[in-house]
Amino acid sequence: MEIFPAIDLKEGRCVRLYQGEFSKETVMNEDPVAQAIIFEKLGAKILHVVDLDGAIVGESVNLPVIEKICKAVRIPVQIGGGVRSLAAVEKLLSVGVEKVILGTAALYDKSFLEEAVRLYKEQIIVGIDAKNGFVATRGWLDVSEISYIDLAKQMESVGVQTIVFTDISKDGTLAGPNFEQLELLQKSVGIRVIASGGVASIQQVKRLNDMNIYGVIIGKALYEKTIDLEKVLQVTKLC
């Protein structure tokens, strides 16, 4: 199982939100580059970075910080937030990003998604963020009428190989992931599923591993030290 330490960028800083509410932010580190280096030194094999400002405005706002992170670490970096054009994908890849996560665009711009997958294959990941089982977009401000399962099936049919699933109600809460929704998702598609939102303990990570979930994104639990990164990496290595 892959462990993805999370760095959420807002106004150039590393922050955490509560249930996706931009008004409920906590600054975890004023220097996201330093935070990336810390995670790498603790043994992280890959980083998950989200441009929260970008998710709202629809373009990469924190690109200079993202580029600095990519240059500062030797491990792969995957980026999401506001990526809604091929030019945006190409720009991120050109500054050293390994994989790009599409969210809103995957739902509303099928031709862009198909072209991105055709050109960049497994480097394109789709983020599916759900509220009460329905897909939320544009920085989680809008909720669509499509279920997360239906969108996941559509993504699989297009050729997407990996999806990141977030239950927004769990994000930043340390209340545990939505195991029920993840289990249904895992049974509904044959592509890799990365779980995100609410993970608070190594026991929960083990349970996700037992469900054959491909990876887990851990944010608040690392910053608040309810999960020790070195320990969870060791545990998942042995699983």
UniProtKB/Swiss-Prot annotation:
Top-level taxon in the UniProt lineage: Bacteria
GO molecular function, one term: 1-(5-phosphoribosyl)-5-[(5-phosphoribosylamino)methylideneamino]imidazole-4-carboxamide isomerase activity
InterPro entries: Aldolase_TIM, His_biosynth, HisA_bact_arch, Isoase_HisA-like, Isoase_HisA-like_bact, RibuloseP-bd_barrel
Keyword set, alphabetical order: Amino-acid biosynthesis, Cytoplasm, Histidine biosynthesis, Isomerase
Pathway linked to the protein: Amino-acid biosynthesis; L-histidine biosynthesis; L-histidine from 5-phospho-alpha-D-ribose 1-diphosphate: step 4/9
GO annotation terms (biological process): L-histidine biosynthetic process; L-tryptophan biosynthetic process
A single Gene Ontology CC term: cytoplasm
Catalytic reactions on record: 1-(5-phospho-beta-D-ribosyl)-5-[(5-phospho-beta-D-ribosylamino)methylideneamino]imidazole-4-carboxamide = 5-[(5-phospho-1-deoxy-D-ribulos-1-ylimino)methylamino]-1-(5-phospho-beta-D-ribosyl)imidazole-4-carboxamide
Subcellular location: Cytoplasm
EC number(s) from the headed UniProt entry: 5.3.1.16
Principal location listed in the UniProt entry: cytoplasm
Residues at the catalytic site: D8, D129
Keyword field contains Transport: no
Family recorded in the similarity comment: Belongs to the HisA/HisF family.
HAMAP family given in the database record: HisA (MF_01014)
Protein name: 1-(5-phosphoribosyl)-5-[(5-phosphoribosylamino)methylideneamino] imidazole-4-carboxamide isomerase
Protein's organism: Bacillus mycoides (strain KBAB4)
UniProt gene name: hisA
